[in-house]
Design a protein with these regions (language model features):
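C-terminal amphipathic alpha-helix
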Residues: 303, 307-310, 314-334, 370-543, ...
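Bacterial N-terminal signal peptides
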Residues: 1-9
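Peripheral, non-AAA+ core regions of ATP-driven protein-machinery
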Residues: 18-282, 313, 322, 326-376, ...
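Generic signature of mature, soluble extracytoplasmic domains
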Residues: 267-319
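Acidic, serine/threonine/proline-rich low-complexity intrinsically disordered regions
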Residues: 540-552
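Sec/Tat signal peptide C-region and signal peptidase I cleavage site
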Residues: 11-16
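Short helix-adjacent coil turns
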Residues: 279, 284-298, 363, 370, ...
């Protein structure tokens, strides 16, 4: 492996693909349909023609052409966007350089064609022929790893019926449920029975080799020793652990007297407010005792967040019990100042790119800006909650009839519940922004290195990630059935959704603007939105996460291993490219290492952290091209 040469445009000895004038190919996608556990459950294939040609527009250009109006569902459309974006990165071409088109027949939908669509688009960009006897199923993650899907036995049988000889499926899914019988089926044994060779796919490279017979360059992973945390970085992390612990303890010192003054029934009735504190303390203490310093920092931050939310919630209830609804509302109003603070920080980070003008400095600024964008997104979700509370209380009636009194009581209860749901979101926003400040204060943007950043490259990436973020948001909403009307409520329960939705909006607002500051904000917001949506899609759809438990456990184990390998390879490329391995990337990787053997929630966070390691390293390479 020779690494990447910025001046000659060669990566690992393979010439960078050129933008094609026009290339197209037809592939057969697999699907399943019918009601599970009935004879209607069956699989099949559907042809689609994919085309790649030079883009003459200034922005991204991805289209789906239908045989019938409405014949292609939202999931399928979003899959095409994400596949085009991912394939462009692997081909080392700007997402904006090509126009991508998919022509479908009949009625198709579903999210499981991500890997096949990506591999096919990549083959068109590289000029490699697609083998007609091959098909596959599986989602694709931003780091190029595959995600599990359902209905694999039915899809395999459908592929065999159409004469396919090779069938790829996601790693960890060899034992898959037959949707007709409910029995667990060995996919490889079923393939042998049907005369189809089955291939377990871990990454896009596996899928590409199966689809084209051509191997992609596989980059050597960095040595693990290079990813160890330096002693000085470890010491600064311990300082931040102490800071978060002190913040949490100070907050609880304010909460405890309020609880002590209550009678036991009242304390018991409010346990839903205080129990998150004790659960978070237990996790933070365990991480610290195990020497998991980075995880301990994050978990003590969770304690501080839970404590602040509890303090605010108790203040809201106290004001409401005194009949002072305005005071209850005003408990949360000071948090709105975070918006201006976050925007000022984003401006400073954007200006730092123009000053330093090198790939490592730019990546550090973008990563720091992502944390600020996360805080800004949470403030946006909180503002939505407060606006709903105001709208509710404005509906109070002046009539004194029993019916009006009952209706008013319901509105007051709804008003208070909105405030109580908003309190944790705004507390998290404050903690997230504080964490971003700490990161910058402890030298999180000081490292420099690599080639100069071209302004047009920064602008192109900002537009690309804004488009990818929008596609990812729509994709997730479609596969879980999240309506726009329920989006705000879901953000209260799942902070990543606030980041995904508000990050997408912020990226769209800034993507077309001129100036380094605006481009850094757009890139950071788009990347944060895209990565958050992808993490949610993997969590709730691919891994079937429900009530704190993951259903597809073998796939989770396989994903963790694949994401880890991908992160190490990306870090190795970055070091060879710039001669620098930013401490931020090292920290993110080690955070994943500390979490990967923890609870299911920890494992989900570990996957996200490995993914962010890959993203940061790949972004540096993209900026340096």
């Amino acid at each position: 492996v020779t690494g990447l040469c910025v001046t000659c445009g060669v990566i690992s000895g393979v010439a960078r693909a050129q933008v094609p004038e026009r290339r197209e190919a037809t592939v057969d996608f697999v699907y399943f349909t019918g009601t599970p556990r009935t004879d209607e459950a069956r699989g099949g294939t559907a042809p689609a023609t994919l085309r790649v040609e030079k883009n003459t527009a200034s922005g991204a250009s991805v289209g789906v052409i239908e045989e019938f109006a409405g014949g292609t569902g939202t999931q399928w459309r979003s899959t095409a966007w994400i596949a085009a974006f991912t394939a462009s990165g692997r081909a080392e071409q700007s997402f904006l350089a090509n126009e991508f088109t998919v022509r479908t027949g009949g009625h198709v939908d579903g999210p499981s064609a991500g890997m096949l669509t990506t591999a096919a688009f990549l083959a068109l960009m590289r000029g490699d022929a697609i083998r007609p006897e091959v098909t596959m199923t599986g989602t694709i993650n931003p780091d190029g790893t595959t995600g599990p899907v359902g209905g694999i036995p039915q899809k395999l049988m459908g592929a065999a019926a159409q004469g396919k000889k090779f069938f790829g499926y996601p790693v960890g899914c060899r034992q898959s449920e037959d949707l007709k019988t409910g029995a667990v089926v060995d996919v490889e044994a079923l393939g042998t029975q049907l005369g189809v060779t089955t291939v377990e796919l871990t990454t896009l490279a596996d899928a590409y080799l199966l689809l084209t017979g051509v191997p992609l360059a596989v980059h050597a992973p960095i040595d693990l020793e290079a990813m160890r945390i330096a002693p000085d970085l470890l010491e600064t992390t311990k300082i931040r652990v102490d800071m978060w612990r002190s913040t949490a303890e100070a907050g609880f010192a304010r909460v405890q007297p309020i609880l002590n003054a209550m009678d036991e029934p009242t304390r018991t009735s409010l346990r839903w407010i205080t129990s998150p504190i004790f659960g978070a303390v237990q996790q933070a203490t365990a991480a610290e005792s195990a020497g998991q310093t980075i995880a301990a920092e994050h978990k003590w931050m969770e304690v501080a967040t839970a404590t602040a939310a509890a303090e605010d919630s108790l203040a809201i209830l106290a004001a409401a019990n005194a009949g002072k609804l305005d005071d209850a509302f005003n408990v949360l109003v000071p948090y709105l100042e975070l918006e201006d603070q976050a925007k000022a920080m984003l401006g400073e980070l954007g200006e730092s790119v123009g000053t330093a003008n090198n790939t490592v400095g730019a990546v550090n600024a973008v990563l720091a800006a992502e944390g600020v964008v996360g805080a800004l997104a949470l403030v946006g979700a909180g503002k939505g909650g407060l606006a709903s509370a105001v709208a509710t209380i404005k509906q109070l009636e002046t009539s004194t009839t029993p019916e009006s009194a009952a209706a008013n009581n319901e509105r007051v209860r709804a008003f208070l519940m909105l405030l109580l749901k908003t309190a944790p979101v705004l507390a998290r926003a404050e903690a997230t922004l504080a964490a971003a400040r700490m990161d910058i204060a402890f030298g999180g943007t000081s490292e420099q290195g690599g080639a100069a950043v071209q302004a047009d490259r920064l602008a192109s990436l900002a537009k690309a990630y804004a488009s990818a973020s929008a596609a990812g948001k729509v994709y997730f909403q479609a596969i879980v059935g999240l309506e726009d009307s329920a989006s705000g409520a879901f953000a209260f329960a799942e902070p990543r959704w606030a980041t995904a939705s508000m990050g997408t909006q912020l990226a769209a607002d800034f993507a077309g603007r001129d100036g380094a500051v605006e481009r850094v904000i757009a890139l950071a917001a788009g990347a944060e939105g895209y990565l958050s949506s992808a993490s949610l899609q993997n969590k709730y759809y691919a891994l079937e996460y429900k009530q704190g438990v993951i259903a597809r456990r073998p796939a989770l184990t396989a994903q963790l291993a694949a994401a880890r390998t991908s992160a190490l390879a990306a870090a190795g490329d970055l070091q060879r490219l710039t001669g620098v391995l930013p401490s931020r990337i090292v920290t993110e990787f080690n955070y994943a290492e500390e979490l990967r053997e923890g609870s299911d929630d920890d494992k989900i966070d570990a996957l996200a952290a490995y993914g962010r390691t890959s993203f940061a390293a790949e972004l540096a390479a993209e900026l340096g091209r």
